[in-house]
Design a protein with these regions (language model features):
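Pore- or pathway-lining transmembrane helices of multi-pass membrane proteins that form conduits
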Residues: 128-150, 174-178
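Hydrophobic alpha-helical transmembrane segments of membrane transport/permease proteins
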Residues: 15-65, 155-174
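Transmembrane helix irregularities
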Residues: 29-30, 138-141, 242
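Membrane-embedded alpha-helical segments of multi-pass transporters/permeases
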Residues: 16, 20, 24-28, 144, ...
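Alpha-helical transmembrane segments of integral membrane proteins
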Residues: 2-4, 88-129, 166-306
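Residue-level signal for discrete positions within transmembrane alpha-helices
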Residues: 12, 93, 97, 133-136, ...
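An internal, D/E-rich "acidic patch" concept
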Residues: 57-113
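N-terminal signal-anchor/signal peptide hydrophobic helix marking the start
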Residues: 6-15
C-alpha cells in the first residue's frame, strides 16, 4: 500500500509539472502582455525598462527556469493586472468555484442515479424512454446556449431568478442546472447500463430466488456492485466540473476561479493563468487519488492488487 501511495504521489507531481510547463509556453504564444497595461504613446525606452523589470527581456529558457524555481516555493509572481500575489488571488476565488461545482455534483447525483436505476429496473417502459431521451438531449444541448436561454426565460421574461452574481440560494439555481445538465445526462446513461449488466449476474438472481425484497436486491446487491463505473465517472466529472465552471461562471458573472482565469487569459496575465492551472491540476489529481482509494472499499480485489 505504501508503494501504491508513493506511486500515485509521483504521478500527481508529474501531471502538475507537465501541465505548468505546457501552459507556460502556450500562454506566450498570445503576444507581449506588457503592451496591454501601458499607454499607446509610451516611449520605447520606458517600455524596455518595464519589460526588464518584469523579466520578459530574458531568454525564454531563463524565464522558464526562474518560473520553475519559484513555483516549487508556491511563488507564481505578481498579477500584472491586480498588482497582488497571483496564487493568493486564485485561492481567494477558489471557494466560490468549489461551492458551485459541489452543488452541481450533488444535483447530478440526485437526478442521474435514481433515473438510471429506475430506467434499468423498468427497462422498455415509458419512464425508461423519457429518462434516456432526456439524457440524450442533455448531452446534446450546449451549456452556453442553455445558460443564455435560461437567463432569457427565467430572469428577463419571468423575473423569477437573478441573472447572475453570487448571493442567496436563488443565485445557485441556474448555474447549477447548466453546469450539471451534461454530466447528469451522461451519468444517468452509464448508471442504467451498469445496473442492467449487474441485474443479469448470478448473485442477483440468487438473491431474488431467496425471496428478498426488490428494494434490498437493488439497493444492497445491485447498486453497490454497479458502483465502480459510476464512481469512476463521478471522479472524472468532479474534475471536469471545475473546468466546465469556466464557461458557466462567465455567463452568470459568478465570481469564481473560472471567470478569473478567462479574464487573465484575455489580459495575458501570465502569473494568474499559471497559478490557476496549478490549482486546477492539484485539485483534479487529488480527486482522482481519492477515487482510487474509494475503489478499495467498493472492490477488495483492488486493494489486493495495490
Amino acid at each position: 500500500m505504501r508503494a501504491y501511495l508513493l506511486s500515485r504521489l509521483g504521478q500527481t507531481l508529474l501531471v502538475v509539472f507537465l501541465s505548468l510547463t505546457a501552459v507556460f509556453f502556450l500562454v506566450r504564444l498570445g503576444g507581449d502582455p506588457v503592451l496591454l497595461f501601458l499607454p499607446m504613446d509610451i516611449q520605447a525606452k520606458d517600455l524596455n525598462e518595464f519589460r526588464e523589470r518584469l523579466g520578459f527581456n530574458d531568454p525564454l529558457a531563463v524565464q522558464y527556469g526562474r518560473f520553475i524555481g519559484r513555483a516549487l516555493h508556491g511563488d507564481f509572481g505578481e498579477s500584472l493586472r491586480y498588482k497582488s500575489d497571483a496564487l493568493q488571488l486564485v485561492l481567494e476565488r477558489l471557494p466560490a468555484t468549489l461551492e458551485l461545482a459541489l452543488a452541481a455534483l450533488l444535483l447530478t447525483f440526485c437526478v442521474a442515479v435514481p433515473v438510471g436505476v429506475l430506467s434499468a429496473v423498468r427497462r422498455g417502459s415509458l419512464f425508461d424512454l423519457l429518462g434516456m431521451g432526456g439524457a440524450v438531449l442533455g448531452q446534446a444541448v450546449p451549456g452556453f446556449w442553455l445558460g443564455l436561454m435560461m437567463i432569457y426565460l427565467f430572469s428577463v421574461r419571468l423575473g423569477w431568478l437573478p441573472t447572475g452574481g453570487m448571493g442567496g440560494a436563488l443565485h445557485f439555481v441556474m448555474p447549477c442546472v447548466v453546469l450539471a445538465s451534461f454530466y447528469a445526462a451522461r451519468m444517468a446513461r452509464l448508471t442504467r447500463s451498469s445496473v442492467l449488466d449487474t441485474l443479469n449476474e448470478e448473485f442477483v438472481l440468487t438473491a431474488r430466488a431467496k425471496g428478498l425484497a426488490e428494494r434490498i436486491v437493488i439497493g444492497k446487491h445491485t447498486l453497490k456492485n454497479s458502483a465502480i463505473p459510476i464512481v469512476t465517472l463521478a471522479g472524472l466529472d468532479t474534475g471536469q466540473l471545475l473546468g466546465g465552471a469556466v464557461i458557466t461562471e462567465t455567463i452568470f458573472a459568478w465570481p469564481g476561479l473560472g471567470r478569473l482565469t478567462v479574464q487573465a487569459l484575455l489580459n495575458r496575465d501570465f502569473p494568474v493563468v499559471l497559478a490557476a492551472v496549478f490549482v486546477f491540476s492539484v485539485t483534479y489529481t487529488l480527486i482522482n487519488f481519492a477515487v482510487d482509494l474509494l475503489y478499495g472499499w467498493l472492490d477488495p480485489r483492488t486493494r489486493a492488487r495495490a
